[in-house]
């Protein structure tokens, strides 16, 4: 590669600076080869040609070291892309750019979820429980002001003298005691009992066992319980 003409000057210091600058430009142009850049390049090409000729003589394909390094780099890159696609739940396109974009979006969503969980943990346990309970109760049952609920009694036979008894009633003082007294008056044995209360109402679930003539007892017991839990007319 041709060298640049060096400036000739009278001052010794200025001449040194120009020489250093020219040497640096030559080294960049010749990729560090200095004055023998062309000779080194020719030697490299000649060596590569000799290697190609030797490989051809042996019936083998000549492989450049730079080419092999590039193939290894691309292999590692493709492996990382495949691993990224395996952990990102939503991939819009199969290109590398789209995979990286989808991964970034997924990371942002995860960061938002972490911030939301941290905010919820920052609330006091009482407030969090109150919000959750209020939301669930509002969705499950929202009574209206003009709604008029009558007492409901349901009996379902389970066989072997056993029944499921469900009673829906408005909570009034002493009402549950009257229900238990009615069951005892017919010698009904209570096997299990669960009660749910909400907004001034209650729903009780009994598993009972009846002795004696079941048909008569069930008809009379249903009538008695209905009269007990029925809402009195105003």
Curated annotation (Swiss-Prot):
Annotated stretches, region: Helix-loop-helix motif: 75-110
This protein's UniProt keywords: Developmental protein, Nucleus, Transcription, Transcription regulation
Top-level taxonomic group: Eukaryota
Segments for region (Basic motif): 61-74
Signal peptide: none
Primary residence: nucleus
GO annotation terms (biological process): anther wall tapetum development; pollen development; regulation of DNA-templated transcription
Start and end residues of each stretch annotated as Disordered: 1-51
Gene3D superfamilies: Helix-loop-helix DNA-binding domain
Compositional bias ranges of the Acidic residues kind: 37-48
Traits of the deletion mutant: Male sterility due to failure of tapetum to differentiate and pollen to mature.
Residue ranges constituting the bHLH domain according to the UniProt record: 61-110
Gene Ontology terms: cellular component: nucleus
Localization in the cell: Nucleus
Gene Ontology molecular-function annotations: DNA-binding transcription factor activity; protein dimerization activity; sequence-specific DNA binding
Role this protein plays: Transcription factor that plays a crucial role in tapetum development. Required for male fertility and pollen differentiation within the developing anther. Plays a major role in maintaining tapetum development, starting in early meiosis. Required for pollen mother cell meiosis. May regulate the anther-specific cysteine protease CP1 and lipid-transfer proteins C4 and C6. Required for anther development. Functions in parallel with GAMYB to regulate early anther development. Functions upstream of the transcription factor TDR and may positively regulate its transcription.
Family membership noted in the UniProt record: Belongs to the bHLH protein family.
Name this protein carries in UniProt: Transcription factor UDT1
